[in-house]
Amino acid sequence: MSKLPLGPEKGPMIVAEISGNHNGSLPRALDIVRAIADTGAHAVKIQTYTADTITLNVDTPAFRISDGHELWGSRKLYDLYEEAHTPWEWHEPIFSLANELGMIAFSTPFDETAVDFLETFDVPVYKIASLEIVDLPLIKQVAETGKPMILSVGTGSIAEVAEAVAAARSGGCTDLTLLACTSSYPAQPDDA
């Protein structure tokens, strides 16, 4: 990711994820961006989706979180995503503030409409979520932007990772970083 502060001579790039920690409040989201800047992080990352673009509004076991989940047990996925998403109209103030504070701002798109939307901000890099590693059309569309791509491989098999890398390369991605990650979070304090 040559355009970003990465490389052996530069040390690690610290990316802070806002996710749904804004609790539905733009002022809180902007406060989080300021707090991230105070830590010296290089970048702020958000997620770009709506409940309608990431799941279906149905109430069946396949679309409900299991009862045993500590935080979200028995909730419908649609309701959780509706509550946790970052409204698209917030992207501009979040990205602008992050840039103003000297940080890179980028996002994880979860569908093609999100990529089209993010391109209006000329984001410098995209991250593909672990669970989207099998969404080869999304990976190819991101690759076609010509931007660097961070591909999380935490849930992928070796074959799925190979297919995702091939999709990125076929879309023209020449700046690809594979990110090994855990897809079970928040982390338990003992694991931190």
Model regions and ranges:
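Catalytic cores and adjacent flexible loops of soluble metabolic enzymes
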Residues: 1-192
